[in-house]
Amino acid sequence: MFRAIPFTATVHPYAITAPRLVVKMSAIATKNTRVESLEVKPPAHPTYDLKEVMQLALSEDAGNLGDVTCKATIPLDMESDAHFLAKEDGIVAGIALAEMIFAEVDPSLKVEWYVNDGDKVHKGLKFGKVQGNAYNIVIAERVVLNFMQRMSGIATLTKEMADAAHPAYILETRKTAPGLRLVDKWAVLIGGGKNHRMGLFDMVMIKDNHISAAGGVGKALKSVDQYLEQNKLQIGVEVETRTIEEVREVLEYASQTKTSLTRIMLDNMVVPLSNGDIDVSMLKEAVELINGRFDTEASGNVTLETVHKIGQTGVTYISSGALTHSVKALDISLKIDTELALEVGRRTKRA
């Protein structure tokens, strides 16, 4: 059972006062039977270990002394129930991760859910219960809620945008919380979106800085094609375009050269108008010009209010950094059964 810090940790060499414990991140793929059975699994990553991210979150909360408040107020042998309560409407996400955290803190805790990841919850709904040692439930509480509230907020916004964007697919970006890339992108999947590239390693994405450094769109594409051929890499290639002229340049290159290009980003071709509406005529022209030869991705000025109109242009994907970089957490709480706690407290003369 979890008490202070049951994790492999090292004392930071420059700590002057109380030692700060640092958990080293592992480059081992997560192996978890609960994950393998999930309907919506976390996206794959070659160096990201989900278990160690959970351990890091617990370790930073526990510090070097553990939960001093729990030690002072909760009997170590106290058993209780605690209920998950939705305090606003939304899409719940992070249920599977919450189970893993509870199991990491105390494998004897029993967790029961009345909904699944991706289900709609309404304000006032009790949607889950955890039973067992009250001390360990409270230790896990904040870490569980931090993950669930953030993931549920992402899933809720993703669901709204994915529904509005249809028939286009909604994507997130790499604008995620540091260290939580996989968790954020997992929440997008739970909300009904699709994942963009995980990082710098799994897709070539030629953006404005690459184009400027290479000397133009055509030269950048040629360099990428040569690099992939020389290194025998087969991965997706996307190029950013900002004007119709750049779209034409990409299409001209592709018509004359065998290329690995798979997707064209149409960046900031959605123009905001003074009346609050948007002009999508440039985006629509670009999509018609490409004419299905490559997948297309609209980026820039994408909001919940604009995404439907963008989705009607025929674009394949719509990407939005707002799904993860400025998400509003869904308000969820975990409350111990007061009557049961008081009854136990009376028996132990602590109430």
Curated annotation (Swiss-Prot):
It catalyses: nicotinate beta-D-ribonucleotide + CO2 + diphosphate = quinolinate + 5-phospho-alpha-D-ribose 1-diphosphate + 2 H(+). GO terms for molecular function: nicotinate-nucleotide diphosphorylase (carboxylating) activity. It is found in: Mitochondrion. Induction: Induced by wounding. Pathway: Alkaloid biosynthesis; nicotine biosynthesis; Cofactor biosynthesis; NAD(+) biosynthesis; nicotinate D-ribonucleotide from quinolinate: step 1/1. Disulfide bonds: none annotated. The keyword S-adenosyl-L-methionine does not apply. InterPro entries: Aldolase_TIM, NadC, NadC/ModD, Nicotinate_pribotase-like_C, Quinolinate_PRibosylTase_N_sf, Quinolinate_PRibosylTrfase_C, Quinolinate_PRibosylTrfase_N. GO terms for biological process: alkaloid metabolic process; NAD biosynthetic process; nicotine biosynthetic process; quinolinate catabolic process; response to wounding. One of its GO terms (cellular component) is mitochondrion. Its EC number is 2.4.2.19. It is an enzyme of class 2 (transferase). Keywords: Alkaloid metabolism, Glycosyltransferase, Mitochondrion, Pyridine nucleotide biosynthesis, Transferase, Transit peptide. Its main location: mitochondrion. Substrate binds at residues 142, 173-175, 197, 207, 240, 267, 299-301, 320-322. Involved in the biosynthesis of pyridine alkaloid natural products, leading mainly to the production of anabasine, anatabine, nicotine and nornicotine, effective deterrents against herbivores with antiparasitic and pesticide properties (neurotoxins); nornicotine serves as the precursor in the synthesis of the carcinogen compound N'-nitrosonornicotine (NNN). Involved in the catabolism of quinolinic acid (QA). Belongs to the NadC/ModD family. This is Quinolinate phosphoribosyltransferase [decarboxylating] 2, mitochondrial. It comes from Nicotiana glauca.
